Amino acid sequence: MSYQLDNGEVVRHEGKFFAMIVCWLLGNGCLFSWNSMLTIEDYYVYLFPKYHPTRVLTLVYQPFALGSIAILAYREAKINTRVRNLTGYTLFFLASLALIILDVATSGRGGIGVFVGVCIVSGAFGVADAHVQGGMVGDLSLMCPEFIQSFLAGLAASGALTSALRLITKAAFENSQDGLRKGAMMFFSISSFFELLCVLLYALIFPKLPIVKYYRSKAASEGSMTVAADLAAGGIQRSQDGAEEDPKLPERLTNKQLFLENIDYAIDVFLIYILTLSIFPGFLSEDTGSHSLGSWYALVLIAMYNVWDLIGRYIPLIERLKLTSRKCLTVVTLSRFLLIPAFYFTAKYGDQGWMIMLTSILGLSNGYLTVCILTAAPKGYKGPEQNALGNLLVMCLLAGIFSGVTLDWLWLIGKGW
């Protein structure tokens, strides 16, 4: 299959499977650094026992992510998507490298100064996340649903991979001197390398794939100005002024109109993540009591969440199991709030088996609902509108995360902090 541009150039419509692999890797890179920081929470709890690092680092991360995505979503129609995404991945790489430099410079010591430095890096991760997650979801929303599903699966895979690596490094270094620190440094070294790989993938490989050029050319023909630089990187030159002035192009819906037409999706995404982040990772890391797994317990819970979140993001690929009814999506989203009393009473009275099961349900439902909503919402819109809607939904997602992280502190009531 091919697509003919206005200037007569033909763009081939092929390479879908390879593009899905690249989307998966780019999704992985979007959260790999942040998940690495979360997954070595036992190292930071050891270094900064008085500062609740799991909760504080997440709370620092979110305002930067939410503030950045709000600005970027408002200006998305005029932002160069290529520069935006490359800026995000480069910032992930530099921030991951900064954590290694900070730890080496301080010889692995704790203290308030070092903790402030780690918090600054956490804020940088938030800014990078807003650039990449909003930019990529918006960009992939104007392509086929399989691409956005692969990207979202990559987001979850980063959590599963970092959890698996953390369990391996904990086992490998558990009995060695300075084992926690060695495991953490290995994590950030891998993270830095992977983020650099994502920079190269997005800069040199992704824009040159035929099917990606096809969808971006189609979006440009519908009036999208955000794809021009990526098309140029793929060898296709288009006039941005022509797209802006062409009277034949139908007017796109405003961001406000798009938001109101999809307000149920926006609320669903917000509620999904306010619930998830009010439990994960803070509650699972600090408030689940002592059990036979000892120091492995929190790591196992986080790993189970990440694995089932990943599985949940692949279930919608089976068409019969994909939830498309907007009312049903809202009902299922609201029903997840029953998990709050379930977690509370299980932490107080239940054993670790029940807690692992609840954590798995939390992850499975989070991944499944996220993919169902973000793949269904862009259907029926033109390219520029799909890009805008993708950014708006990511803004709601990050708003939900920020609210959930804030509410997570309520679990500390009555614990003397």
Role assignments for model-derived ranges:
Residues 1-26:
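Cytosolic juxtamembrane N-terminal segment immediately preceding the first transmembrane helix
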Residues 16, 94, 102-121, 204, ...:
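Membrane-interfacial loop- and helix-cap regions that link adjacent transmembrane helices
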Residues 30-42, 280-287:
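Extracytoplasmic
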Residues 41-54, 79, 102-113, 146, ...:
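Extracellular/lumenal inter-transmembrane loop segments of multi-pass membrane transporters
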Residues 51-52, 116, 134-135, 141-157, ...:
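Loop-to-transmembrane helix entry/capping segments in MFS-fold secondary transporters
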Residues 57-69, 125, 129, 144-198, ...:
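Glycine-rich segments within core transmembrane alpha-helices of 12-TM secondary carriers
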Residues 64-87, 92, 310-327:
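Helix-to-loop junctions at the C-terminal end of transmembrane segments
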Residues 122-143, 148-149, 366-381:
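Intracellular juxtamembrane helix-capping segments at the cytosolic ends
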